Regions:
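Small/polar loops that bind or transfer phosphate-bearing groups
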Residues: 4, 51-54, 154
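Catalytic-core segments of class I nucleotidyltransferases/pyrophosphorylases
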Residues: 76, 90, 94, 98, ...
Length: 199
């Protein structure tokens, strides 16, 4: 598990590493719920690494910071901007990935007037009512340019080879390196991507 944070967000790291704070509370409160939570933290702490992105240079730039830690052929990326509370769409995305041996992105329908706030995908082929092969992703298009109202949400299963694309990628809109631009480059190389709609 890799967290990408800035130096200003040390509180996230402290949540896992501030042992003195937890032990002090446990001693004072003697609440079994706190003890249970602390044991959970100890378990996950061994699996967690932190990398820093101190300048907001885009999601692609942030992902590039994790390269040395990614060993598997594919990895799951979650953006904290998009909170998905009720349904664990990561679980269903992993099922789709295993079935089709493909990269997968979580998606939802957005109002056409709001497309410029999202990465938007173009459908190539319907798999079933919730899953589609895609043949294009455009980062924050105008209403005139948009291929659809299907937005890419912040959950991705991506291939390790995306790092070689990101290393050469030039900044896009807003001077940032966008992960969707790298995805589009992979699609052009005939790499399979599936959009997974969820509610």
């Amino acid at each position: 598990i890799i967290f990408i944070i800035s130096k200003k967000k040390q509180m996230i790291k402290d949540y896992f590493y501030n042992d003195k704070f937890y032990l002090k509370i446990i001693k004072k409160k003697k609440d079994p719920r706190i003890i249970k939570e602390y044991k959970k933290i100890l378990k996950y702490k061994k699996m967690i690494k932190f990398v820093y992105q101190n300048k907001p240079l885009g999601t692609g730039h942030a992902v590039l910071k994790t390269q040395k830690y990614i060993k598997d052929k594919y990895f799951l990326m979650l953006l904290p901007d998009d909170l998905i509370i009720k349904n664990n769409c990561s679980k269903s995305m992993i099922k789709i990935h295993k079935r089709y041996k493909s990269s997968v992105m979580a998606s939802m329908n957005v109002k056409k007037k709001n497309v410029s706030r999202w990465g938007i995908y173009k459908l190539e082929k319907k798999i079933d009512k919730n899953n589609f092969f895609i043949n294009a992703v455009i980062e924050k298009p105008s209403i005139k340019q948009t291929p659809s109202n299907k937005a890419v949400i912040g959950r991705y299963i991506l291939p390790k080879e995306i790092f070689s694309i990101l290393q050469k990628q030039k900044p896009g809109i807003g001077g940032e390196i966008h992960i969707t631009d790298a995805i589009q480059s992979l699609i052009k190389k005939n790499k399979k991507f599936i959009a997974h709609n969820f509610k």
